[in-house]
């Protein structure tokens, strides 16, 4: 077994999950060389068996809600030296697994890496939402590879580090994360929109001596339902992401901002309402929510 694909799902949308599984069925890597583990993370009702066509797919349950719990369970249940983390709304390019193996061989020090995440929107997005596409795990860092070497302790988060959607992990890098003490970082859990787990994996592997990288040869389609472009959702998402982002940087000693007294957070948020003119429109309100999340993440 050369590659293990881990998909963590909590009450997934049936149509989007079907697209994800169809993308796996279309992989160019021979089925004998990879496996897929679908982790049912406290779905209600439990996930039904998928339709035939993926003989190398297993479903296991993880009753503790939260993406970190589901990922840890998946990593412990898989066997391959190379792991691909996919979401239940990701459609991997047909050569994704083959490319992941090829790139891992070319870059033996890359412990975590990813590539392009291209949106497929259920409804056409309003022009003003483009500013916030990064919040939706959409990215394209260009046509060339980008590598951050782990030769020295990081002073900042490596900007070429992979997002969770399609992240490729070497087993040894993943093991460093599994063996590390639980830092208590918030991650996706039910309706909560925090996401510190991706950063924690990357920074733990980086500290263990593994490079992190972006390779444009890797590509996936990210299925975006209309509800994720609603202003209220984007506001909650930005607040949760910014808070957990700062907490992850702080836990790993690479946060560029000083800690703040808890009592000072609310007055700063009030001031930021005016600084960012949060009343002036949806985009301004979403930006302000991000500032609020960052301030909450810095509170000690």
Language model regions located:
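Acidic donor-binding loop at a coil-to-helix junction in glycosyltransferase catalytic cores
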Residues: 164, 184-201
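Short aromatic/hydrophobic "clamp" motif used to bind/position activated sugar donors
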Residues: 83
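Glycine-rich, basic loop-to-helix element that forms the pyrophosphate-binding segment
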Residues: 62-78
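A conserved acidic beta->alpha catalytic loop
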Residues: 23, 40-48, 90
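Conserved donor NDP-sugar-binding/catalytic core segment of glycosyltransferases
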Residues: 95-129
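Short, flexible, basic/aromatic active-site loop/helix in glycosyltransferases
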Residues: 133-159
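Non-catalytic, C-terminal membrane-associated alpha-helical segments of glycosyltransferases
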Residues: 236-243, 253-300
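Short, acidic, metal-binding catalytic loop of nucleotide-sugar glycosyltransferases
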Residues: 22-33
């Amino acid at each position: 077994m050369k590659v293990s694909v881990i998909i963590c799902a909590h009450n997934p949308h049936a149509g989007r999950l079907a697209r994800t599984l169809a993308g796996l069925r279309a992989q160019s890597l021979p089925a004998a060389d990879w496996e897929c583990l679908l982790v049912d993370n406290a779905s209600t009702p439990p996930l039904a068996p998928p339709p035939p066509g993926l003989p190398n797919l297993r479903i296991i349950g993880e009753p503790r809600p939260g993406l970190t719990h589901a990922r840890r369970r998946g990593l412990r249940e898989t066997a391959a030296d190379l792991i691909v983390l996919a979401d239940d709304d990701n459609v991997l390019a047909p050569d994704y697994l083959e490319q992941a193996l090829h790139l891992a061989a070319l870059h033996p020090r890359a412990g975590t890496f990813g590539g392009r995440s291209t949106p497929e929107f259920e409804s056409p997005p309003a022009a003003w939402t483009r500013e916030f596409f990064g919040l939706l795990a959409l990215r394209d860092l260009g046509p060339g590879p980008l590598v951050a070497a782990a030769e020295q302790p990081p002073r900042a988060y490596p900007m070429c580090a992979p997002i969770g959607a399609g992240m490729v992990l070497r087993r040894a890098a993943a093991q460093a994360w599994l063996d590390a003490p639980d830092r208590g970082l918030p991650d996706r859990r039910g309706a909560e929109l925090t996401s510190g787990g991706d950063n924690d994996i990357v920074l733990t592997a980086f500290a263990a001596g593994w490079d992190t990288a972006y390779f444009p040869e890797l590509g996936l389609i990210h299925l975006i339902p209309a509800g994720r472009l609603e202003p209220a959702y984007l506001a909650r998402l930005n607040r949760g992401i910014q808070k957990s982002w700062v907490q992850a940087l702080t836990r790993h000693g690479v946060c560029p901002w000083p800690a703040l007294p808890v009592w000072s957070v609310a007055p700063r948020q009030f001031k930021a309402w005016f600084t960012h003119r949060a009343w002036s429109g949806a985009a301004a309100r979403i930006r302000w929510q991000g500032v609020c999340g960052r301030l909450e993440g810095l509170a000690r």
